[in-house]
Amino acid sequence: MQKLKQQVFEANMELPRYGLVTFTWGNVSAIDRERGLVVIKPSGVAYETMKADDMVVVDMSGNVVEGEYRPSSDTATHLELYRRYPSLGGIVHTHSTHATAWAQAGLAIPALGTTHADYFFGDIPCTRGLSEEEVQGEYELNTGKVIIETLGDAEPLHTPGIVVYQHGPFAWGKDAHDAVHNAVVMEEVAKMAWIARSINPQLNHIDSFLMNKHFMRKHGPNAYYGQK
């Protein structure tokens, strides 16, 4: 697990590097599907002092199997998503400014241009709010459940992120670094959408044919973006 702990540590350290977190906010995890174990950031440990060996290993029930610290308080959310979507290899949660603003506004981040379409096939959805019962109960688990309720059976890697109403963004990917990459892009397109709608409140969504072209040339069966 040492290699995966190193990867998760490096991915967590990318969050302050890209300006996605303040203080100890945010967390990244990754899963070893063969072993049924998840590596995740410890709760409340400062990025400035954090080391790879500080990463916490939990099983799919959330029991700590390796590590000196308590795992992230959002661990149950991560585990619920891993259980539901086998294609996920890494998950990240932040409170990045612009994506969180859309979450607080209770609005999906609209697909307005090709930057968005290169990564997200359609709007980045916003969940419903959690009920008082859901918050007072197993809050973090129910956060995962409301994300799943919103995504349904859609392939999560086609829209690798979501904003949780009144909370903030979650993103995911094939591994921890891919999840952080998508979180960075989500923050950027959230900012772009806010600026674009401020300039033109009547702005329409990107044309579907243009969105399809940009997404499929990077992610479709006949993708040709980049090098083989």
UniProtKB/Swiss-Prot annotation:
InterPro entries: Aldolase_class_II_sugar_metab, Aldolase_II/adducin_N, Aldolase_II/adducin_N_sf, UlaF
Xref: PANTHER family: FUCULOSE PHOSPHATE ALDOLASE (PTHR22789), L-RIBULOSE-5-PHOSPHATE 4-EPIMERASE ULAF (PTHR22789:SF9)
Protein name: L-ribulose-5-phosphate 4-epimerase UlaF
MF terms in GO: aldehyde-lyase activity; L-ribulose-phosphate 4-epimerase activity; zinc ion binding
Class of the enzyme per the UniProt entry, highest EC level: isomerase
Stretch forming the signal peptide: none
Induction text: Induced by L-ascorbate. Repressed by UlaR.
Pathway assignment: Cofactor degradation; L-ascorbate degradation; D-xylulose 5-phosphate from L-ascorbate: step 4/4
Family: Belongs to the aldolase class II family. AraD/FucA subfamily.
Binding site for Zn(2+): D74, H93, H95, H167
